[in-house]
Amino acid sequence: MKIQIKKIVGVLLACAGIMTSTSCADFEEINKNPYLPDKDMEQKDGVLNGAYMPNLEKHIIPVPLKTDNTDLTNAYQISINLCGDSWIGYFSPRDNKWNEASNTTTFFFSEGWVNLMYEYAITNIFAPWIQLKNINMSGENPNKEMYAIAQISKIMGLHRSTDKFGPIPYKQVGNGSFTVEYDSQESVYRSFFEELDEAVTVLYDFYMKANNTVPMASDVVYEGDVTKWIRLANSLMLRLAIRVRYADEVLARTYAEKAIKNPIGVMESIDDMAKMNRGANLQTKHPMYQIADPGQYNDSRMGATIQCYMKGYADPRISKYFQDQG
């Protein structure tokens, strides 16, 4: 009797083991949606790049789509229009109505505005960049070209941030840590130069192999044109080199010469302009239209400084930049 029971239990356990191993083996396959791409397909087809790259690019300078709400326009107004634009005299508030004139235009920094500047200048750049880094650099066959474009885009957004805030979290971002140390502005700038240099090298090598474009759907600025990305990166490298010329003359000269001597060169034509491209099936609207339009925010007017320069030099662009309201 005992022998029979043992045999029955043994058979049952064996069957259970077979069922378990079979169900475990098939579980992932059974739960796949046959109508959606899996991760391997998404990486091969550039689906994920097409999701995150445009999101990164539209936050370099906050540029809303026509279908967006006013969040990006408000971010642009607080972090750019009522900040640097006002300080250098390009624009001036029509009515300094915010917080009884105690705001950035009068060099008063409220916590709410500063936090918003930080969020849109740093958090919204790093979030899609981290995804792009993981997508393009974590497999056996990394997509170095797309990552190079992501690097250039990241630096385009963040060089303004370190100029505003000084030290920022940078070198350790994206490494999976819950807390990230702040890097000095000098350290951040040195990383900028190194990363731009590497990005240009990657894209130039790609170009020399007779490859002039990356997937267009993933890039709403240059629609995948590698040579234009190289010119933008070199121009950005030159800009940053000029900014550090008094802090580190040798560093500035090194990277200024790298930018100028690159065979592709720097931006010299309006065709090289970096902008959200309408040809990428996107309808964008510049925040200044909404900020200055009398029928919308009606908050901004020409600044005295730029008026003096443009009138003094009889600059013909003045009628394109500004309209006389009478």
Question: What does each model-identified segment do?
Answer:
Residues 43-47, 93-326:
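Structured, solvent-exposed acidic/aromatic patches
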